[in-house]
């Protein structure tokens, strides 16, 4: 029923109402259905007496009809009549009133409430209203809209009370069937009988609490669909309090829990089917009558609705402007990934089980028979374990290191692609696990279910009904989650893309209004449902795997990341269910005390957990960084000893490196990557013409002073005279940071005559600017420090295409690799060689364009950094 937000403050004048034509009035006090009909102190109108008589007449069925099976059929027929009158009769009237104001127009057209109208119908209706509202009520002083609503209320009273009474008739007659089956302990174990009665009574009491709490909140105005006829002033929004904060549309959802409680008590599948049918019709009524009217009155304005649609469309840009595949939903024949997913799902859910069933009993391996059932089970478990580990590990790496995002940026691929491709991987893995689980059960079905292996095999129809209900619940919950957080949230988008201002807070709309993590339980209830239908050991193990992985992923992967991005206050905000339980079960004084004291420990506990993980990660990163930089941190003396240069102090052979730079006496001399290195040598007159000098990494040669045991890989030159010089450049250089040395070798062999002083090759450090306005200066620095040393021919200007110069190099691909590596090392922004020759597909990439791309990449990575996220949270 349409729900109004704020309870009006009780004043002597009562709440104010306004008709859709603009007339204002004071809304008089009215009574609820139960008090009106059954309270003897309240005066009854003629129509109310007729309603009571009709309700009592249902008892004639027990007196006039002697056969219980006939009674059941009569009551089912009566219930169907009143249920259809409710959902389609009242539904039709409300639809006409909501869209065309038909009921009010009919009253105006017939002058029903006109004092001069003395027709029988007019007099009866006015008499009914006077009896209902009391002698002080003046019909002419109130709008036709309000008086029409009062008449409509009596129609509702008749239909709703008759609907419930005939349903109780179905319950009683079915419970009486088969020698009082609902209490008969000879037909069922006593503990089961008592359990049924207790659980059923609990559901009925819960249903009663829902109805009473709902009525206390929304009053008669919304209970009788008052907002179809007029509006109460200052009630522009929907209410979310009490039971409305715990469940979506409680009058239509959990408000029918009592129906299933009656079915349990009656021990009747007939009652269960009738309850399901009635509940189903009620959901249709909600969807086609109630929700459209709620959206019209309380929903967003036209501009707001358009904005929401535009936001959803914009979100699709992360998925190539198409709705991504979820399971097999949004399937498109034009997407290769969708076709592959369909083939995979069909293969594992149908083809493999069908093939496996055909070789049961005949399959052998090395003469031994293979248990195909065990193989199918092992396959399902292996797939689920693989999916769990791969997705969890991947999300952790993405959360802390942005592994996937950096990989895409390094190849000049838009970061939106990282999310769209992740969505394909994620959906494929999830679909694979569900297909294998369905396939396992399909295999057992076509090979013949061994019911003896079930933990319980009674109540087949009940188990099937509850199992199907759980499966449908998971489908509905998943759909509701996507409606609330979109495909961006469904595929963990905030692990991959920077949060925008529109996503600076966690949503509390839709299903998230009632539960903080609806997927924690309901996200795998479909697996529970299938396990309930076929309760075998294999299914229980699979169900445990699904539930455990779901719990771990939400609490130790997703929640940790959410705290990092949105903050603990957002993540640990009470859900609607929690708020209502606190309000109902904990006194206000204690609740306030707990809320003030409880948040700090919670904060500390979760903070310590997240900080522990972050601390371990930071320590590991620091250790690796120090390890990589350890050569640069060695003292000059240690390096000399490490390279064993001191052993050749008095040698007749000598190598001098001419163009090294010096920064500190304690540190070795250095040059930058790509800079040509000039050496001079001297040796005795009688040296061999086959003497040669090679360039090596110190860490690879330190264990051998007298002989070099590794190849120079082309980084060498002949010594043709007693004195001379040579410039190592291009492919004869190392293109990575490290500590190096030159070695003088004798007679074309690897015996060492001299080892030069060690020196360092460093990458030039280039600071990437924060804004595009500094891109030209940045480009000039890139050209001078990176491109000029690497390319054989210097690039003419920063606006010249890079490819024109690189293509003139002797080693095209190697030059691209060197450029990419040096740019990555110098700027701290990792790119690949593909970045350089793919980036200029439409326009040839220049150094200036490259500098702009690097600035943009830096901005994206900074937006994804913990510091930026913390700054956004503070704002």
Swiss-Prot record:
Which ranges does the record list as Cytoplasmic topological domains? 66-73, 176-189, 267-270, 361-376, 444-464, 548-875
Write the Enzyme Commission number(s) for this entry.
Answer: 2.1.1.17
Q: Does the keyword Lipid metabolism apply?
A: yes
Q: Report the top EC class in one word.
A: transferase
Entry keyword Acetylation: no
Q: What ranges are annotated Lumenal (topological domains)?
A: 1-44, 95-154, 211-245, 292-339, 398-422, 486-526
Query: What transmembrane ranges does the database entry give?
Result: 45-65, 74-94, 155-175, 190-210, 246-266, 271-291, 340-360, 377-397, 423-443, 465-485, 527-547
One MF term from GO for this chain?
phosphatidylethanolamine N-methyltransferase activity
Taking the record's annotation, the residue ranges forming a coiled coil are none
**From which domain of life does this come?**
Eukaryota
Q: Which GO terms describe its biological process?
A: methylation; phosphatidylcholine biosynthetic process
Topology of the protein relative to the lipid bilayer: Multi-pass membrane protein
A GO cellular component annotated for this chain's UniProt record is: endoplasmic reticulum membrane
Catalytic activity annotation? a 1,2-diacyl-sn-glycero-3-phosphoethanolamine + S-adenosyl-L-methionine = a 1,2-diacyl-sn-glycero-3-phospho-N-methylethanolamine + S-adenosyl-L-homocysteine + H(+)
Which keywords annotate this record?
Answer: Endoplasmic reticulum, Lipid biosynthesis, Lipid metabolism, Membrane, Methyltransferase, Phospholipid biosynthesis, Phospholipid metabolism, S-adenosyl-L-methionine, Transferase, Transmembrane, Transmembrane helix
Pathway field of the UniProt record reads:
Phospholipid metabolism; phosphatidylcholine biosynthesis
Kindly list the places in or outside the cell where this protein is found, as annotated in its UniProt entry. Answer: Endoplasmic reticulum membrane
* One Pfam family matching this protein: PEMT
> What InterPro entries is this protein classified in?
Phopholipid_MeTrfase, Phosphatid-EA_MeTrfase_fun
The record's annotation in PANTHER family points to: PHOSPHATIDYLETHANOLAMINE N-METHYLTRANSFERASE
Give the function comment from the record. Catalyzes the first step of the methylation pathway of phosphatidylcholine biosynthesis, the SAM-dependent methylation of phosphatidylethanolamine (PE) to phosphatidylmonomethylethanolamine (PMME).
The record's similarity note reads:
Belongs to the class VI-like SAM-binding methyltransferase superfamily. CHO2 family.
State what protein this is by name.
Answer: Phosphatidylethanolamine N-methyltransferase
Organism of provenance: Meyerozyma guilliermondii (strain ATCC 6260 / CBS 566 / DSM 6381 / JCM 1539 / NBRC 10279 / NRRL Y-324)
